[in-house]
């Protein structure tokens, strides 16, 4: 299973292509006196676990907002990519803008310090980028900076040290060259899965921040391609589509039918440190399940599915498909607490003192492919549950109607991708 996800954040004037020298402003004062580099290199335990609850809360708040506005549509995004990008941006935000970003991401700054937040992301990104058997996860960021603007050394140093961001200085007036530079970098880092991410840029942009996630994982129990056949998928009461349906009927899996909620939950493992939860609402109950989809509910299901009595032999039917999601974040995030960031009231003076910056446009794109071997990009899958007669007592799971999917990093307790598959034939 492979996952790829990209986020492009454009701040007013943030980009250009040239081979000139990058001007770093050493004399300017940052709005924060704390040294994230020194703080983050110390610490004990697993700092990423401290930020996991807030990251999960943001994931489900973002999902609920999208789902409420686009009923009947596929959804797919990487909350981790969005959170990491904006947490990095907060290094250059000051006063109310900095607190709005961090609190908008779900962090309670009276319980968790800013240094704890950045330490958590540093540990999280480092852990996810470690090589693993059968699992490849790559998370990265890049800053494309105008060579005509002087950037504060502390902001650049912290983004490189904490978020391992790569810096590119460019001539922003060379629009064609700048777009080519960004797209070539994204294409390379995403193994060719995302091409032509940027099609146009305004010349008042001074910086572009790009964050991406590439996730490629193999099923712990793969499907056999010769057993994949066309089957019906019931989008709604009036729409049925044909999809290539994979089959697995000799394996045991972790699944349950929730006795308190109208849904079934399946957990499937990938090789390495990742797992996926497929949540199948009963017919007509999708909205009811979406309303109770919280970090606490996900942990409840996860804890239940550790019990041996939920490990059962299944006849499993899962569609082979590709979906994607694209979101204009500057229209979404203000409703999640980022009230001033995309306005003239934004304070990004921790990036440069030379001139005032505003966040102009922010985009997020995620793609997912699911096949017999695993998944590429971000993943979502749907299934229905059905039982044979009492005489056979055999369990069948059919992913043949809309469902929810959560891809999860076990060691960091992080939601990597979250989505809903309504129509697996729609990209």
Swiss-Prot record:
General remark: Heparin blocks kallistatin's complex formation with tissue kallikrein and abolishes its inhibitory effect on tissue kallikrein's activity.
Sites annotated Reactive bond: 388-389
Tissues/organs with expression: Expressed by the liver and secreted in plasma.
Cross-referenced PROSITE patterns: SERPIN
GO cellular component terms listed in the entry, alphabetical order: extracellular exosome; extracellular region; extracellular space; platelet dense granule lumen
GO molecular function: serine-type endopeptidase inhibitor activity
Record's function text: Inhibits human amidolytic and kininogenase activities of tissue kallikrein. Inhibition is achieved by formation of an equimolar, heat- and SDS-stable complex between the inhibitor and the enzyme, and generation of a small C-terminal fragment of the inhibitor due to cleavage at the reactive site by tissue kallikrein.
Keyword list, A-Z: Glycoprotein, Protease inhibitor, Secreted, Serine protease inhibitor, Signal
Pfam families assigned: Serpin (PF00079)
Family to which this protein belongs: Belongs to the serpin family.
Protein name: Kallistatin
Complex formation: Monomer and some homodimers.
Predominant cellular place of this UniProt entry's protein: secreted
């Amino acid at each position: 299973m492979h996952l790829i996800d990209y986020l492009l954040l454009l701040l007013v004037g943030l980009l250009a292509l040239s081979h000139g020298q990058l001007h770093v402003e050493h004399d300017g004062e940052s709005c924060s006196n704390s040294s994230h580099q020194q703080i983050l290199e110390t610490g004990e335990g697993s700092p990423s676990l401290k930020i996991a609850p807030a990251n999960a809360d943001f994931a489900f708040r973002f999902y609920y907002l999208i789902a409420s506005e686009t009923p009947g549509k596929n959804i797919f995004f990487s909350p981790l990519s969005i959170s990491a990008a904006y947490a990095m941006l907060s290094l250059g935000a000051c006063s109310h803008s900095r607190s709005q970003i961090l609190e908008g991401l779900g962090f309670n700054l009276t319980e968790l310090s800013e240094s704890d937040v950045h330490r958590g992301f540093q540990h999280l990104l480092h852990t996810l980028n470690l090589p693993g058997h059968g699992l490849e996860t790559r998370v990265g960021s890049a800053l494309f900076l105008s060579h005509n603007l002087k950037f504060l050394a502390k902001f650049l140093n912290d983004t490189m040290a904490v978020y391992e961001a790569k810096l590119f200085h460019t001539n922003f007036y060379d629009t064609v060259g700048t777009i080519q530079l960004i797209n070539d970098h994204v294409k390379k880092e995403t193994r060719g899965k995302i091409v032509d991410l940027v099609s146009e840029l305004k010349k008042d942009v001074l910086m572009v921040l790009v964050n991406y996630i590439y996730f490629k994982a193999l099923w712990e129990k793969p499907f056999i391609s010769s057993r994949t056949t066309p089957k019906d998928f019931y989008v709604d009461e009036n729409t049925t589509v044909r999809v290539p349906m994979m089959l697995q009927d000799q394996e045991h899996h972790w699944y349950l039918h929730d006795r308190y909620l109208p849904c079934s939950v399946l957990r499937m493992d990938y090789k390495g440190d990742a797992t996926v939860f497929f949540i199948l609402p009963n017919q007509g109950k999708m909205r009811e399940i979406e309303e109770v989809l919280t970090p606490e509910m996900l942990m409840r299901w996860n804890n239940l599915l550790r019990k041996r009595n939920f490990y059962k032999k299944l006849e499993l039917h899962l569609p082979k498909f590709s979906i994607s999601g694209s979101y204009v974040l500057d229209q979404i995030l203000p409703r999640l607490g980022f009230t001033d960031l995309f306005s003239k009231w934004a304070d990004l003076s921790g990036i440069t003192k030379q001139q005032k910056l505003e966040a102009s446009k922010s985009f997020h794109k995620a793609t997912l492919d699911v096949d017999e071997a695993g998944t590429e990009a971000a993943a979502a899958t749907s299934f229905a549950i059905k039982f044979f007669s009492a005489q056979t007592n055999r369990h069948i799971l059919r992913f043949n109607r809309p469902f929810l999917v959560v891809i999860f990093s076990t060691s960091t307790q992080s939601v990597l991708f979250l989505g809903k598959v309504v129509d697996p034939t729609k990209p």
